[in-house]
Design a protein with these regions (language model features):
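Flexible, low-complexity segments enriched for small/polar residues
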Residues: 7, 11, 15-42, 51-191
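Alpha-helical scaffolds flanking conserved acidic
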Residues: 47-49
Length: 191
């Protein structure tokens, strides 16, 4: 086992898996190579490998920012956290995760659900992801209580533009949403 753990292929395999989890489905080779070197130099110290990953400039590259897709459960939990939703019926998280394609305890492989965007994204799952967001905002999920006013210092946005800007900044803080906002506003104005 010690020989296997010290083999460069093991280091590369583990570095690739970690980088795929945290950076992108196809992580940058430079990051993986540095992580593998750290793995070998530290006798497999995962903490040091992860530090190498987050210290690498490619980890913070804007191009990689939008490459990771959350699993349905991760999406549900992050939406609940971002909106400050009070959950008194947690089974709804599992119900919605299942609607979005992640049925707990029913994936046959012992490795668990794949950590790849292609597994989670298709027409039906995208629609259910949007429906989940709409259901939270519209208070349509039993046992979920979202106070949208609290997200905007307890007052309603003064216009549709203000609402779009306020909630986009809150829910998508690191992305430039100008193009999407303009598209949405053109649709709203046309109605």
């Amino acid at each position: 086992l010690a020989m296997l753990a010290a083999h460069p292929s093991t280091a590369h395999f583990i570095a690739t898996k970690l980088a795929a989890k945290f950076i992108a489905d196809a992580p940058p080779t430079a990051v993986v190579d540095e992580m593998a070197k750290t793995f070998l130099a530290t006798n497999g110290d995962i903490k040091e490998v992860l530090l190498t990953m987050v210290m690498h400039p490619d980890f913070w590259a804007k191009a990689k920012e939008k490459e990771k897709i959350k699993s349905p459960f991760e999406l549900a939990v992050s939406a609940i956290r971002a909106t400050g939703t009070d959950v008194v019926a947690p089974y709804q998280v599992f119900t919605w995760s299942e609607k979005m394609g992640q049925k707990f305890y029913f994936y046959q492989a012992p490795t668990g659900f794949p950590d790849r965007a292609s597994f989670w994204i298709n027409t039906g799952s995208l629609l259910n992801r949007m429906n989940f967001g709409m259901a939270i905002a519209a208070q349509k999920i039993p046992g979920f209580k979202t106070n949208l006013l609290a997200l905007n210092q307890n007052h309603e946005p003064e216009s549709v533009e203000d609402a779009l800007q306020t909630y986009t900044k809150l829910l998508l803080p690191v992305s430039d949403q100008k193009e999407n906002s303009e598209r949405i506003m053109s649709i709203v104005r046309a109605q």
